[in-house]
Protein backbone atom coordinates (compact mmCIF):
# COMPACT_ATOMS: atom_id res chain seq x y z
CA UNK A 1 0.00 0.00 0.00
CA UNK A 2 1.27 3.44 -0.91
CA UNK A 3 1.64 6.01 1.82
CA UNK A 4 -0.13 9.29 1.08
CA UNK A 5 2.00 12.29 0.28
CA UNK A 6 0.60 14.42 3.11
CA UNK A 7 1.33 11.78 5.74
CA UNK A 8 4.80 11.25 4.36
CA UNK A 9 5.51 14.99 4.40
CA UNK A 10 4.35 15.25 8.01
CA UNK A 11 6.54 12.32 9.07
CA UNK A 12 9.58 13.78 7.35
CA UNK A 13 8.95 17.19 8.87
CA UNK A 14 8.76 15.64 12.32
CA UNK A 15 12.00 13.72 11.68
CA UNK A 16 13.83 16.81 10.47
CA UNK A 17 12.64 18.92 13.43
CA UNK A 18 13.31 16.22 16.01
CA UNK A 19 16.85 17.46 16.69
CA UNK A 20 15.55 20.94 17.48
CA UNK A 21 13.79 19.78 20.66
CA UNK A 22 15.58 18.28 23.63
CA UNK A 23 14.23 15.34 25.60
CA UNK A 24 12.98 15.45 29.16
CA UNK A 25 16.17 13.93 30.57
CA UNK A 26 18.38 16.46 28.79
CA UNK A 27 16.12 19.34 29.82
CA UNK A 28 16.00 18.49 33.53
CA UNK A 29 19.68 17.57 33.68
CA UNK A 30 20.57 20.91 32.11
CA UNK A 31 18.51 22.81 34.69
CA UNK A 32 20.11 21.00 37.63
CA UNK A 33 23.69 21.02 36.37
CA UNK A 34 24.44 23.81 33.92
CA UNK A 35 26.35 22.58 30.86
CA UNK A 36 29.91 23.49 30.17
CA UNK A 37 30.56 26.12 27.48
CA UNK A 38 31.71 23.50 25.00
CA UNK A 39 28.53 21.42 25.38
CA UNK A 40 26.37 24.52 25.07
CA UNK A 41 28.10 25.51 21.84
CA UNK A 42 27.64 22.08 20.27
CA UNK A 43 23.94 22.06 21.23
CA UNK A 44 23.50 25.40 19.52
CA UNK A 45 25.03 23.96 16.38
CA UNK A 46 22.59 21.04 16.51
CA UNK A 47 19.60 23.41 16.32
CA UNK A 48 20.22 24.12 12.63
CA UNK A 49 20.13 20.77 10.78
CA UNK A 50 21.76 21.22 7.38
CA UNK A 51 21.63 19.50 4.92
CA UNK A 52 18.42 17.45 4.93
CA UNK A 53 18.80 13.82 5.78
CA UNK A 54 19.08 11.22 3.04
CA UNK A 55 16.16 8.82 2.50
CA UNK A 56 16.27 5.84 4.79
CA UNK A 57 16.63 2.36 3.28
CA UNK A 58 17.28 -1.16 4.44
CA UNK A 59 20.82 -2.56 4.12
CA UNK A 60 19.42 -5.70 2.42
CA UNK A 61 18.11 -3.74 -0.55
CA UNK A 62 19.65 -4.17 -3.94
CA UNK A 63 21.76 -1.59 -5.71
CA UNK A 64 18.85 -0.59 -7.89
CA UNK A 65 16.59 0.04 -4.85
CA UNK A 66 18.90 2.52 -3.09
CA UNK A 67 17.00 5.46 -4.52
CA UNK A 68 13.36 4.39 -4.37
CA UNK A 69 12.05 7.92 -4.38
CA UNK A 70 13.59 8.67 -7.73
CA UNK A 71 11.36 6.00 -9.32
CA UNK A 72 8.17 7.12 -7.58
CA UNK A 73 6.29 9.72 -9.50
CA UNK A 74 2.97 11.41 -9.05
CA UNK A 75 0.08 11.35 -11.38
CA UNK A 76 1.55 14.08 -13.54
CA UNK A 77 4.72 12.00 -14.11
CA UNK A 78 7.20 14.75 -13.16
CA UNK A 79 10.21 13.58 -11.11
CA UNK A 80 10.48 16.96 -9.39
CA UNK A 81 7.65 15.95 -7.04
CA UNK A 82 9.82 13.21 -5.53
CA UNK A 83 12.44 15.77 -4.43
CA UNK A 84 9.86 17.94 -2.75
CA UNK A 85 9.38 15.17 -0.19
CA UNK A 86 13.00 15.54 0.86
CA UNK A 87 13.47 19.31 0.67
CA UNK A 88 11.26 22.32 1.06
CA UNK A 89 10.88 25.03 -1.51
CA UNK A 90 13.37 27.21 0.33
CA UNK A 91 16.07 24.54 0.13
CA UNK A 92 15.96 24.51 -3.70
CA UNK A 93 16.04 28.16 -4.78
CA UNK A 94 17.91 27.44 -8.01
CA UNK A 95 15.92 24.47 -9.31
CA UNK A 96 14.18 25.19 -12.57
CA UNK A 97 11.08 22.99 -12.95
CA UNK A 98 11.12 23.51 -16.73
CA UNK A 99 14.44 21.63 -17.09
CA UNK A 100 14.16 17.84 -16.82
CA UNK A 101 16.08 16.30 -13.94
CA UNK A 102 18.61 13.51 -14.22
CA UNK A 103 17.80 9.93 -13.31
CA UNK A 104 20.44 8.40 -11.06
CA UNK A 105 19.35 4.83 -11.76
CA UNK A 106 20.63 5.07 -15.33
CA UNK A 107 24.03 6.54 -14.26
CA UNK A 108 27.03 4.19 -14.58
CA UNK A 109 28.45 2.88 -11.29
CA UNK A 110 31.55 4.85 -10.20
CA UNK A 111 33.73 3.84 -7.25
CA UNK A 112 34.20 7.39 -5.98
CA UNK A 113 30.49 8.36 -6.10
CA UNK A 114 28.88 9.76 -2.99
CA UNK A 115 25.48 8.33 -2.06
CA UNK A 116 24.28 11.60 -0.55
CA UNK A 117 23.34 15.11 -1.60
CA UNK A 118 26.53 16.71 -0.15
CA UNK A 119 30.11 16.89 -1.42
CA UNK A 120 32.74 14.90 0.42
CA UNK A 121 35.10 17.16 2.34
CA UNK A 122 38.08 14.88 1.68
CA UNK A 123 37.66 14.94 -2.10
CA UNK A 124 37.04 18.69 -2.02
CA UNK A 125 40.23 19.15 -0.01
CA UNK A 126 42.22 17.09 -2.53
CA UNK A 127 40.80 19.10 -5.41
CA UNK A 128 41.59 22.32 -3.59
CA UNK A 129 45.21 21.21 -3.00
CA UNK A 130 45.60 20.34 -6.68
CA UNK A 131 44.20 23.73 -7.60
CA UNK A 132 46.62 25.46 -5.21
CA UNK A 133 49.61 23.58 -6.67
CA UNK A 134 48.68 24.47 -10.21
CA UNK A 135 48.04 28.07 -9.11
CA UNK A 136 51.53 28.29 -7.59
CA UNK A 137 53.05 26.76 -10.73
CA UNK A 138 51.34 29.32 -12.95
CA UNK A 139 52.34 32.11 -10.57
CA UNK A 140 56.01 31.09 -10.77
CA UNK A 141 55.88 30.90 -14.57
CA UNK A 142 54.19 34.28 -14.66
CA UNK A 143 56.85 35.74 -12.33
CA UNK A 144 59.70 34.45 -14.52
CA UNK A 145 58.04 35.86 -17.63
CA UNK A 146 57.49 39.18 -15.93
CA UNK A 147 61.12 39.30 -14.73
CA UNK A 148 62.37 38.73 -18.29
CA UNK A 149 59.88 41.13 -19.96
CA UNK A 150 58.53 43.63 -17.38
CA UNK A 151 55.08 45.05 -18.02
CA UNK A 152 53.04 47.65 -16.18
CA UNK A 153 49.70 45.84 -16.34
CA UNK A 154 48.56 43.27 -13.80
CA UNK A 155 47.45 39.94 -15.30
CA UNK A 156 44.91 37.66 -13.69
CA UNK A 157 45.91 34.03 -13.10
CA UNK A 158 44.72 31.75 -15.93
CA UNK A 159 42.13 29.10 -15.32
CA UNK A 160 43.43 25.63 -14.61
CA UNK A 161 42.35 23.10 -17.27
CA UNK A 162 40.38 20.12 -16.14
CA UNK A 163 42.94 17.72 -17.62
CA UNK A 164 45.45 18.58 -14.85
CA UNK A 165 43.24 17.30 -12.05
CA UNK A 166 43.08 13.64 -13.03
CA UNK A 167 39.98 11.55 -13.48
CA UNK A 168 40.50 9.32 -10.47
CA UNK A 169 40.16 12.17 -7.94
CA UNK A 170 37.08 13.79 -9.50
CA UNK A 171 33.46 12.95 -8.80
CA UNK A 172 30.76 12.87 -11.40
CA UNK A 173 28.59 15.96 -10.68
CA UNK A 174 25.51 14.30 -12.14
CA UNK A 175 25.71 11.58 -9.50
CA UNK A 176 25.74 14.10 -6.67
CA UNK A 177 23.63 17.02 -7.91
CA UNK A 178 20.47 15.74 -9.64
CA UNK A 179 19.55 19.16 -11.01
CA UNK A 180 21.35 21.07 -13.79
CA UNK A 181 24.72 22.56 -12.91
CA UNK A 182 24.18 25.58 -15.15
CA UNK A 183 21.87 27.15 -12.58
CA UNK A 184 23.78 26.18 -9.46
CA UNK A 185 26.87 27.64 -7.92
CA UNK A 186 29.22 25.58 -5.77
CA UNK A 187 32.00 27.40 -3.93
CA UNK A 188 34.47 24.99 -2.40
CA UNK A 189 36.41 27.67 -0.61
CA UNK A 190 33.35 29.02 1.23
CA UNK A 191 32.11 25.58 2.33
CA UNK A 192 34.33 25.42 5.39
CA UNK A 193 37.32 23.68 3.79
CA UNK A 194 39.46 26.81 3.73
CA UNK A 195 41.51 27.25 6.89
CA UNK A 196 43.90 30.05 7.97
CA UNK A 197 46.87 27.78 7.41
CA UNK A 198 45.69 27.00 3.87
CA UNK A 199 45.23 30.67 3.06
CA UNK A 200 48.70 31.45 4.36
CA UNK A 201 50.20 28.94 1.95
CA UNK A 202 49.16 31.02 -1.06
CA UNK A 203 51.98 33.46 -1.77
CA UNK A 204 52.16 35.94 -4.60
CA UNK A 205 55.66 35.61 -5.99
CA UNK A 206 55.53 38.87 -7.94
CA UNK A 207 54.76 41.03 -4.91
CA UNK A 208 57.44 39.29 -2.86
CA UNK A 209 60.03 40.01 -5.54
CA UNK A 210 58.95 43.65 -5.64
CA UNK A 211 59.38 43.88 -1.88
CA UNK A 212 62.86 42.38 -2.14
CA UNK A 213 63.82 44.92 -4.81
CA UNK A 214 62.57 47.82 -2.69
CA UNK A 215 64.41 46.57 0.39
CA UNK A 216 67.57 46.20 -1.66
CA UNK A 217 67.27 49.78 -2.87
CA UNK A 218 66.83 51.09 0.65
CA UNK A 219 69.82 49.12 1.89
CA UNK A 220 72.04 50.41 -0.93
CA UNK A 221 71.12 54.05 -0.32
CA UNK A 222 71.89 54.03 3.43
CA UNK A 223 73.99 51.00 4.32
CA UNK A 224 75.49 52.29 7.56
CA UNK A 225 72.47 53.91 9.19
CA UNK A 226 72.04 51.24 11.87
CA UNK A 227 75.73 51.23 12.63
CA UNK A 228 75.80 54.99 13.11
CA UNK A 229 72.84 54.95 15.50
CA UNK A 230 74.45 52.10 17.41
CA UNK A 231 77.66 54.14 17.77
CA UNK A 232 75.63 57.07 19.08
CA UNK A 233 73.94 54.87 21.64
CA UNK A 234 77.24 53.42 22.82
CA UNK A 235 78.89 56.82 23.29
CA UNK A 236 76.53 57.63 26.19
CA UNK A 237 77.13 54.42 28.16
CA UNK A 238 80.82 53.55 27.94
CA UNK A 239 84.23 55.21 27.41
CA UNK A 240 85.15 56.20 23.91
CA UNK A 241 87.04 53.35 22.22
CA UNK A 242 86.47 53.33 18.49
CA UNK A 243 88.35 50.45 16.82
CA UNK A 244 89.71 51.81 13.57
CA UNK A 245 92.22 50.33 11.15
CA UNK A 246 95.24 52.15 12.52
CA UNK A 247 97.47 55.14 11.96
CA UNK A 248 98.75 55.86 8.48
CA UNK A 249 102.36 54.59 8.74
CA UNK A 250 103.20 56.18 12.06
CA UNK A 251 101.37 59.44 11.49
CA UNK A 252 98.88 60.46 14.22
CA UNK A 253 95.17 60.24 13.50
CA UNK A 254 91.92 60.70 15.38
CA UNK A 255 91.92 56.99 16.26
CA UNK A 256 94.77 57.61 18.72
CA UNK A 257 92.65 60.21 20.52
CA UNK A 258 89.46 58.19 20.59
CA UNK A 259 91.20 55.02 21.80
CA UNK A 260 92.55 56.81 24.91
CA UNK A 261 90.28 56.47 27.98
CA UNK A 262 88.64 59.60 29.30
CA UNK A 263 90.25 59.36 32.77
CA UNK A 264 93.70 59.18 31.22
CA UNK A 265 92.96 62.26 29.11
CA UNK A 266 91.81 64.10 32.23
CA UNK A 267 95.01 63.39 34.12
CA UNK A 268 97.68 63.31 31.43
CA UNK A 269 96.19 65.10 28.42
CA UNK A 270 97.09 68.65 27.48
CA UNK A 271 94.74 70.93 25.56
CA UNK A 272 97.38 72.15 23.14
CA UNK A 273 98.58 68.63 22.36
CA UNK A 274 95.04 67.47 21.59
CA UNK A 275 94.49 70.42 19.24
CA UNK A 276 97.76 69.72 17.43
CA UNK A 277 96.86 66.06 16.95
CA UNK A 278 93.44 67.01 15.57
CA UNK A 279 94.96 69.49 13.12
CA UNK A 280 97.45 66.87 11.93
CA UNK A 281 94.70 64.32 11.44
CA UNK A 282 92.68 66.81 9.35
CA UNK A 283 95.74 67.52 7.21
CA UNK A 284 96.30 63.78 6.73
CA UNK A 285 92.69 63.28 5.69
CA UNK A 286 92.77 66.12 3.14
CA UNK A 287 96.13 65.01 1.71
CA UNK A 288 94.97 61.40 1.40
CA UNK A 289 91.78 62.53 -0.39
CA UNK A 290 93.74 64.66 -2.90
CA UNK A 291 96.27 61.91 -3.58
CA UNK A 292 93.44 59.43 -4.05
CA UNK A 293 91.83 61.67 -6.70
CA UNK A 294 95.13 62.37 -8.54
CA UNK A 295 96.73 58.90 -8.76
CA UNK A 296 94.56 55.82 -8.42
CA UNK A 297 97.10 53.28 -9.66
CA UNK A 298 99.52 53.79 -6.78
CA UNK A 299 99.42 51.10 -4.09
CA UNK A 300 100.04 53.56 -1.27
CA UNK A 301 97.08 55.71 -2.30
CA UNK A 302 94.85 52.65 -2.65
CA UNK A 303 95.74 51.52 0.88
CA UNK A 304 95.01 54.98 2.29
CA UNK A 305 91.71 54.99 0.40
CA UNK A 306 90.74 51.65 1.98
CA UNK A 307 91.61 52.98 5.41
CA UNK A 308 89.48 56.06 4.82
CA UNK A 309 86.58 53.99 3.53
CA UNK A 310 86.67 51.70 6.55
CA UNK A 311 87.22 54.42 9.13
CA UNK A 312 84.78 56.92 7.64
CA UNK A 313 81.96 54.98 5.98
CA UNK A 314 79.46 57.85 6.00
CA UNK A 315 78.86 61.39 7.16
CA UNK A 316 77.17 60.13 10.33
CA UNK A 317 80.35 58.43 11.51
CA UNK A 318 82.33 61.63 10.83
CA UNK A 319 79.85 63.62 12.89
CA UNK A 320 80.10 61.18 15.78
CA UNK A 321 83.90 61.34 15.61
CA UNK A 322 83.92 65.13 15.72
CA UNK A 323 81.42 65.11 18.55
CA UNK A 324 83.58 62.69 20.51
CA UNK A 325 86.65 64.88 20.07
CA UNK A 326 84.66 67.93 21.11
CA UNK A 327 83.49 66.14 24.24
CA UNK A 328 87.07 65.26 25.16
CA UNK A 329 88.16 68.89 24.80
CA UNK A 330 85.16 70.12 26.75
CA UNK A 331 85.90 67.76 29.63
CA UNK A 332 89.51 68.93 29.67
CA UNK A 333 88.38 72.56 29.82
CA UNK A 334 85.99 71.87 32.70
CA UNK A 335 88.70 70.04 34.58
CA UNK A 336 91.08 72.99 34.18
CA UNK A 337 88.40 75.41 35.36
CA UNK A 338 87.71 73.28 38.42
CA UNK A 339 91.38 73.11 39.37
CA UNK A 340 91.72 76.90 38.99
CA UNK A 341 88.78 77.46 41.33
CA UNK A 342 90.31 75.11 43.87
CA UNK A 343 93.61 77.00 43.71
CA UNK A 344 91.81 80.33 44.12
CA UNK A 345 89.96 78.98 47.15
CA UNK A 346 93.25 77.98 48.76
CA UNK A 347 94.66 81.53 48.25
CA UNK A 348 91.78 83.19 50.10
CA UNK A 349 92.46 83.05 53.88
CA UNK A 350 88.78 82.96 54.84
CA UNK A 351 88.08 79.88 52.63
CA UNK A 352 91.18 77.89 53.49
CA UNK A 353 89.24 75.56 55.83
CA UNK A 354 86.04 75.41 53.73
CA UNK A 355 86.31 72.42 51.37
CA UNK A 356 82.83 72.71 49.83
CA UNK A 357 82.68 76.39 48.99
CA UNK A 358 80.58 77.39 46.03
CA UNK A 359 82.06 79.09 43.01
CA UNK A 360 80.09 82.28 43.67
CA UNK A 361 81.35 82.44 47.26
CA UNK A 362 84.89 81.84 46.09
CA UNK A 363 84.63 84.68 43.57
CA UNK A 364 83.14 87.14 46.11
CA UNK A 365 85.69 86.39 48.80
CA UNK A 366 88.47 86.59 46.25
CA UNK A 367 87.36 90.05 45.04
CA UNK A 368 87.16 91.31 48.65
CA UNK A 369 90.58 89.91 49.37
CA UNK A 370 92.03 91.54 46.26
CA UNK A 371 90.55 94.95 47.20
CA UNK A 372 91.98 94.67 50.70
CA UNK A 373 95.36 93.80 49.25
CA UNK A 374 95.23 96.86 47.01
CA UNK A 375 94.44 99.16 49.99
CA UNK A 376 97.28 97.69 51.93
CA UNK A 377 99.57 98.19 48.98
CA UNK A 378 98.61 101.85 48.83
CA UNK A 379 99.33 102.40 52.50
CA UNK A 380 102.64 100.64 52.17
CA UNK A 381 103.61 102.89 49.28
CA UNK A 382 102.82 105.96 51.36
CA UNK A 383 104.84 104.63 54.27
CA UNK A 384 107.72 103.90 51.94
CA UNK A 385 107.66 107.46 50.60
CA UNK A 386 107.75 108.95 54.11
CA UNK A 387 110.58 106.66 55.08
CA UNK A 388 112.56 107.75 52.02
CA UNK A 389 112.12 111.42 52.95
CA UNK A 390 113.22 110.77 56.52
CA UNK A 391 116.21 108.83 55.28
CA UNK A 392 117.18 111.74 53.05
CA UNK A 393 116.90 114.23 55.92
CA UNK A 394 119.01 112.08 58.18
CA UNK A 395 121.72 111.78 55.55
CA UNK A 396 121.86 115.57 55.11
CA UNK A 397 122.16 116.10 58.87
CA UNK A 398 124.89 113.50 59.09
CA UNK A 399 126.83 115.20 56.31
CA UNK A 400 126.50 118.57 58.08
CA UNK A 401 127.89 117.14 61.30
CA UNK A 402 130.83 115.44 59.60
CA UNK A 403 131.92 118.50 57.57
CA UNK A 404 133.83 120.45 60.40
CA UNK A 405 135.60 117.28 61.50
CA UNK A 406 137.18 116.81 58.13
CA UNK A 407 138.62 120.31 58.12
Curated annotation (Swiss-Prot):
Residues 1-16 have a biased composition (Acidic residues). One of its GO terms (molecular function) is DNA binding. Its main location: nucleus. Residues 285-306 have a biased composition (Low complexity). Residues 321-373 form the bHLH domain. It comes from the Eukaryota. PROSITE patterns: BHLH. It is found in: Nucleus. SUPFAM superfamilies: HLH, helix-loop-helix DNA-binding domain. Residues 1-92, 134-155, 284-323 are annotated as: Disordered. Residues 58-74, 134-144 have a biased composition (Basic and acidic residues). InterPro entries: bHLH_dom, HLH_DNA-bd_sf, Myc_transcription_factors, Tscrpt_reg_Myc, Tscrpt_reg_Myc_N. SMART domains: HLH. One of its GO terms (cellular component) is nucleus. Transcription factor that binds DNA in a non-specific manner, yet also specifically recognizes the core sequence 5'-CAC[GA]TG-3'. Activates the transcription of growth-related genes. This is Myc protein. It comes from Asterias rubens (Common European starfish).
